Amino acid sequence: WVYKKLGVGDIMYRDYDSHVIQEGGFFQAEYNRNKLAAFVSGSLSNTTYWRYGRFYYDKDHARSKTVNYMGFTVKGGANYNINEYHNVFVNVGVISRAPKFAYGAFMTSTTSNVTNPNAKNEKIYSAEAGYGFKSAWLTANLNVYYTLWRDKAMTKTGTLTNKETGKETDYYMNMTGVGARHMGVELELKSEPLTWLSLNGMLSIGNWEWDNNATGYAYNDAGQPLTSNGGIASGVMADDHAW
């Protein structure tokens, strides 16, 4: 199709179907008595991915391998009303969820059936604690939080330049195992000093950082591994595969 005049309805570069099947179950239990309210919840899920590519594959090889990821969530929290004005609360949670279809489970989902052998469930561990105040004219909520992200999949794009010819090749880099740490303090205020006047204020102070050195490998738009000069590498994750 590179040297052919195309018309309405012609297909070029990509022609594929993404298939995603998800099954799961959920439960939640609650307790509410006197000044204390609490809950615990959880879920279990299975995510199935496969791809059917018609542009770069013949009929016998059009369907990719099927990959499955089991995930779950566990959450719990409690709130205690000290009196009619003051309350304190705490929440914790753990989440394990399937990587994304594109640039997660599949290396180049738009053009290739190649799956990512290093794709893992993304894990999130989070906790928060806070204090609340409520009166006739002022409502305030203060909370602190701490969240860890593990095995996150991310994509980076850029350009590789051949030092001898100057030719530039666009690449994408599929990174897995990315970790991050988020922590901070949040304050929310709402005041109604007059019946016709409402004032709202918010303050958020956070420290969000990447906390590991993740490795990714460079590929072109066709899903081929690239060298640091933009050429085709000898294999996926081979010695000459750019990372």
Give, region by region, the residue ranges found by the protein language model.
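Transmembrane beta-strands of outer-membrane beta-barrel proteins
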Residues: W1-V2, F39-S43, N91-G93, N141-Y145, ...
